[in-house]
């Protein structure tokens, strides 16, 4: 982030790290956590498909216990790593887990995460994105899988941790959005009156 700031001093520099669950949890957890400990002002987004899809379907730390995959034929023996809780304990000001079944919600969460990281400190977003090829499902079955896992008691019920500083940012963003909507409505009304 420092290099971006020195290279582009007049531009807002947001850093967003995009990685799969293998890179975030299994291979890169140490580096990810160290950035959180140091309060690096960037957002980490983990695309959690619960396995190593690019290399044949091996289990990842985020695979659910008991899940059977091509390269994990006996099922995973250990619980899924609770990464949102780790992010919270490591110093993230905003940490959440959700599925990609509701694109508008995903957009809102990511915008919040990026702005909180810019203004307050590190943020973490875990997005459940099932690999339908590896789990043997059709597209709509994958969507149903996400929706089912969001239900109460499901493994992807949205969890969210927000520090008081981050909540202030979220509240301000909501107020600004409401003001923009009211201004647009008033402008549209003026135009309608002028046309009539």
Stretches found by the model and what they are:
Residues 1-54, 108:
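Thiamine diphosphate
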Residues 6-11, 61-116:
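Conserved thiamine diphosphate
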Residues 49-51, 102, 127-134:
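Glycine-rich beta-alpha junction loops
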């Amino acid at each position: 982030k420092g290099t971006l700031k020195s290279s582009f001093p007049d531009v807002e520099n947001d850093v967003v790290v995009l990685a799969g669950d293998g890179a975030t949890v299994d291979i890169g957890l140490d580096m990810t956590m160290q950035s959180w400990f140091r309060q690096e002002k960037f957002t980490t987004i983990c695309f959690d498909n619960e396995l190593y899809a690019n290399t044949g379907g091996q289990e990842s730390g985020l695979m659910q216990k008991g899940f059977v995959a091509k390269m994990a034929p006996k099922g995973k023996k250990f619980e899924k790593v609770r990464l949102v809780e780790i992010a919270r304990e490591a110093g993230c000001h905003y940490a959440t887990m959700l599925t990609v079944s509701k694109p508008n919600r995903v957009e809102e969460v990511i915008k919040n995460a990026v702005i909180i990281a810019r203004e307050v400190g590190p943020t973490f977003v875990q997005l459940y994105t099932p690999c339908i090829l590896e789990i043997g499902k059709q597209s709509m079955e994958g969507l149903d899988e996400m929706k089912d896992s969001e239900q109460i008691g499901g493994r992807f019920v949205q969890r969210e941790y927000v520090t008081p500083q981050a909540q202030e940012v979220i509240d301000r963003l909501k107020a600004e959005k409401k003001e923009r909507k009211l201004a647009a409505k008033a402008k549209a009304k003026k135009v309608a009156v002028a046309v009539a």
